[in-house]
Amino acid sequence: MPTINQLIRKERKKVVKKTKSPALVECPQRRGVCTRVYTTTPKKPNSALRKVAKVRLTSKFEVISYIPGEGHNLQEHSIVLVRGGRVKDLPGVKYHIVRGALDTAGVNKRTVSRSKYGTKKAKATDNKKK
């Protein structure tokens, strides 16, 4: 433990918090252009074809982003909105594409957790008899 004189001579170092999504540059989301849309396989215990896209952000970073949900309409040159959030079983994927924003369509026939997948509420059919 330092003495008061030691603290006067040299103050304590501030702990700098390292961001987990540096490409967003202090912003909640960033716009970007898809440069490549492809599938990749996850790490060892899991097995699937995960849909990902390489995105060139407005902050000049080129990042790999995960496309959540079943099915998508993205292709090269699509304009997308990217948020932070990693995918645990895909190394190097630290960003998610926001569904239902800009060129990205929402997930079709989604009934639960719709806000996460950009799906509008389905029209209520009149099944009740009056």
From Swiss-Prot:
Which GO cellular component terms are attached? small ribosomal subunit
Q: Which UniProt keywords apply?
A: Methylation, Ribonucleoprotein, Ribosomal protein, RNA-binding, rRNA-binding, tRNA-binding
* Ranges of Basic residues composition bias in the record: 111-122
Example GO biological process: translation
What Pfam families would the database entry show?
Ribosom_S12_S23
Q: Which SUPFAM superfamilies does the record cross-reference, listed alphabetically?
A: Nucleic acid-binding proteins
Modified residue 3-methylthioaspartic acid is at which positions? Answer: D89
Which InterPro entries does its entry note?
A: NA-bd_OB-fold, Ribosomal_uS12, Ribosomal_uS12_bac
Give the span(s) annotated as Disordered.
110-130
A molecular function annotated in GO for this UniProt entry is:
structural constituent of ribosome
User: Which family, according to the similarity comment?
Assistant: Belongs to the universal ribosomal protein uS12 family.
Q: Show the NCBIfam families listed in the entry.
A: rpsL_bact
| Subunit structure as annotated in this protein's UniProt entry | Part of the 30S ribosomal subunit. Contacts proteins S8 and S17. May interact with IF1 in the 30S initiation complex.
Task: Explain the purpose of this protein.
Answer: With S4 and S5 plays an important role in translational accuracy.
Annotated protein name in UniProt: Small ribosomal subunit protein uS12
Which gene does this sequence derive from?
rpsL
